[in-house]
Amino acid sequence: MNTQPLRVGIGGPVGSGKTALTLALCLALRDRYNLAVVTNDIYTREDADFLVRNQALAPERIIGVETGGCPHTAIREDASINLEAVDQLNRRFPGLDLILVESGGDNLSATFSPELSDLTIYVIDVSAGDKLPRKGGPGICKSDLLVINKIDLAPLVGASLELMNSDTQRMRNGKPFVFSNQKTGVGLEEIVAFIERQGLLTAA
């Protein structure tokens, strides 16, 4: 049995689908694992409220952190506010298996502190254009898993998934990535399998 929960950081630009992915992961994993969530917003608890409204988990299992500044700082340079939220959840629910830490929307240079996250998932979306993987940055190149979301929008924005696939392979140098559409569940099974495999999770 794990003495400490697996902490999975979910990052990405504003509007890429981080909260939708967090919701989908909660719904997929909550019956198998002892699970909790920390969300980050600059001035509100909007993402936490969204998860509560959509019954992702019991409200007491979701903590919304108001960072009050650059969301990057709260997950990297000074992660204390998030670490305190993680500690609070551990005290509230002894024996947690998994804590999802969703960052506030940020730029392509955002990364999680190793003190806060054991695995990182970075979410980008097709509506930003097929050139996005080529722009690189730590999230695209170095995250443990890259999720390319909203693939259904590719025809609407003139984005080539084939080009995104080849560019992403080149930029990630063998690291895994998944194409997804959280509205329909495409890619979710692969993301769940990645978390379980890389996080060494064993369902009760």
UniProtKB/Swiss-Prot annotation:
A molecular-function term among this protein's GO annotations: nickel cation binding
Subcellular location(s) per record: Cytoplasm
Principal location class: cytoplasm
A GO-annotated cellular component: cytoplasm
Matching CDD domains: UreG
Entry keyword DNA-binding: no
Keywords, comma-separated and alphabetical: Chaperone, Cytoplasm, GTP-binding, Nickel insertion, Nucleotide-binding
Swiss-Prot/TrEMBL GO biological process terms: urea catabolic process
Cytoplasm in keyword set: yes
Binding site for GTP: 12-19
Entry's family note: Belongs to the SIMIBI class G3E GTPase family. UreG subfamily.
Assembly and binders: Homodimer. UreD, UreF and UreG form a complex that acts as a GTP-hydrolysis-dependent molecular chaperone, activating the urease apoprotein by helping to assemble the nickel containing metallocenter of UreC. The UreE protein probably delivers the nickel.
Role: Facilitates the functional incorporation of the urease nickel metallocenter. This process requires GTP hydrolysis, probably effectuated by UreG.
The protein's name in its UniProt record: Urease accessory protein UreG
Organism: Pseudomonas fluorescens (strain SBW25)
